[in-house]
Structure formats: structure tokens, C-alpha cells
Regions:
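A residue-level marker of the well-folded mature domains of exported/periplasmic proteins
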Residues: 1-294
């Protein structure tokens, strides 16, 4: 975009409290034309700031109140991370099949543990899509979910992962932001799927892959809109087809044979629209399809 470093002001580790409002106001007072809030709990504070600074664009990740706020300078954005979670579930399901084939587990003991942050829609849709991906490869797979009630709690995530393993889970995944769960899996020799980043640095013998976000797609788009003087969408969401989500490289030392080829096949199907993670085509209401009802 041709911006210089002094045109970008960054604030990190902003809590989900009044500090978020203070940070947003400070950025606006510094002359920022567009401000991004990147944690779910920042939204109400960004809404407050947006009402006070109508000439500044405020963009909030993972939120939902922009459309109902009536503020033309308030925007919500997220990517279709559920698509990447589905693909990472395929990786996990293939690993379970490999463990069944080599006698490490049986079909009846193919149980996944999921370390969730909060019982929010974002987390629920994420583990649902992950489970659908796993089930597409290993139909006998079951899954148990436990929450830490925090986005980032290293010890809490490690503790929940250990509890899930003690409860019979033979593979762990997560929607939480630290390396706590993968570290536990490495110690206990249990395969895992991480989140956000490649976990092989902390779990080289356990990590399979991680679904990951490419926020740069949105940041580039939104900032370009400001530069061009064009409107930013109130709600924005893109996925694999636009490069907004992906999975980290498959750890060949842990993954099942043939995983790379299957992942390519599934990703291409999502991109061309032949595979829908949440396929409602077979849903009916009183015998009528949703399409007919609409």
C-alpha cells in the first residue's frame, strides 16, 4: 500500500475493558484514520469511540454489532476460519484412521478432546466444523469439549488438555491462543491440532497442523478503501478462496500417509464451491427444503 512505518501505530495487550476505549480514543487523537480492534470484548468500547469520532473508521474483529449500531463508520470483520478448521479436522480424522490401522486405538476409542476458550458462537462453530472434518474421514470419531473461559491461559489450557487425555481422548485440538495444550500433548505423546501458528516448535512429535488466519487480506482491503475514499463493508467475511484462511504445513513426521493429497483435494472443493462445510441442502422443515421455504 506504500505506507511508511510512522503511518502505522500499534497498541498491544489491550484488555477487554475500558482500556480498549482509552486506546481507541488515543489513536483517534493521534490522527489515525482507521482503527482496528482485534479481540471480541473490545467491541462495545469501539462502538463508544466510533460514536464520538464519526470521521474515523473503526473495524472490529469477530464482532456482530456494527450493522445494528447505525454507525456508518463501524465495521465488523472475520474470516471463514471454520473452513480451515474443517480441513484441520480432515487431517485429524486421517490420523485417527492411521492409529486404528496400526492398533494404537480401536474404532470405539477414537475420541477427540477439544480445548475451547468460551462457549461462544465463534468457538462452537469452530469445533463443529473441525468435528465434521474429522468425521468425514473417521466416522466412528467422538469428541469431548471443555472450556478454559479465557482466550489465552497457558496453564489453564495445559490443564484442560491433560484432563481430556485422562478422560480417554487420543487426539487434542483447540480454540485457545497459547501453546499450553500442544506442550501437554508433546509430553504425553498425544497428537494434536493447534491454532493460529505452527505448533511444531513446541510439539515436534505431536503437532499435526493448525488452522490459521490471514488478517492481511482484510487489513489491505480496509486501508485501501480509506485511501481510495470508498466505503468499507459493514460486515466482511472471506475464506480459502480469497486466501483469508489456511492451515500451517502438515507435519509429515506425525501425520498419516496421504494427508497432503487429501488436504489439497478438500481445499480445492471448498474453493470451487463443491464442498460446503455447513451443508443445509438436506435440511427440511415439515417436509419442505429450506430453499423452497425461502
Amino acid at each position: 500500500l506504500g505506507l511508511s512505518e510512522d503511518q502505522v501505530v500499534e497498541k498491544t495487550l489491550i484488555p477487554e475493558d475500558e482500556s480498549a476505549y482509552d486506546a481507541a480514543v488515543d489513536l483517534a487523537d493521534q490522527g489515525c484514520n482507521i482503527i482496528f480492534g482485534t479481540s471480541f470484548g473490545h467491541e462495545s468500547y469501539l462502538l463508544q469511540a466510533a460514536a464520538e469520532y464519526p470521521e474515523v473508521q473503526f473495524c472490529h474483529a469477530t464482532g456482530y454489532q456494527a450493522a445494528s449500531s447505525g454507525l456508518s463508520n463501524m465495521h465488523n470483520y472475520f474470516d471463514s476460519i471454520y473452513e480451515a478448521r474443517y480441513v484441520s479436522g480432515v487431517v485429524a480424522g486421517m490420523k485417527l484412521n492411521g492409529m486404528i490401522a496400526d492398533g494404537t486405538i480401536t474404532e470405539d476409542t477414537a475420541k477427540i478432546g477439544y480445548v475451547g476458550a468460551f462457549p461462544y458462537a465463534e468457538v462452537i462453530s469452530g469445533f463443529t466444523s473441525f468435528y465434521l472434518g474429522a468425521k468425514s474421514q473417521c466416522p466412528s470419531a467422538t469428541m469431548e469439549v471443555q472450556y478454559t473461559n479465557s482466550w489465552a491461559d497457558m496453564s489453564g489450557e495445559a490443564e484442560v488438555a491433560a484432563k481430556l487425555i485422562d478422560d480417554g481422548c487420543v487426539l487434542i485440538s483447540q480454540h485457545a491462543d497459547t501453546t499450553g495444550a500442544p506442550s501437554t500433548c508433546e509430553d504425553k505423546k498425544v497428537p494434536c491440532v493447534g491454532y493460529n501458528v505452527d505448533m511444531t516448535t513446541v510439539a515436534p512429535d505431536a503437532a499435526l497442523t493448525s488452522p490459521t488466519n490471514n488478517w492481511g487480506v482484510y487489513y489491505t482491503h480496509a486501508v485501501q478503501c480509506v485511501l481510495d475514499g470508498t466505503a468499507i463493508e459493514t460486515d466482511w467475511c472471506q475464506g480459502f478462496a480469497e486466501g483469508a484462511v489456511d492451515i500451517t504445513p502438515i507435519n509429515e513426521a506425525v501425520a498419516a500417509e496421504g494427508t497432503d493429497a487429501k488436504v489439497t483435494e478438500v481445499e480445492n472443493a471448498i474453493k470451487d464451491g463443491s464442498l460446503h462445510v455447513f451443508d443445509t441442502s438436506a435440511f427440511t422443515v415439515n417436509g419442505s427444503s429450506l430453499e423452497d421455504l425461502i
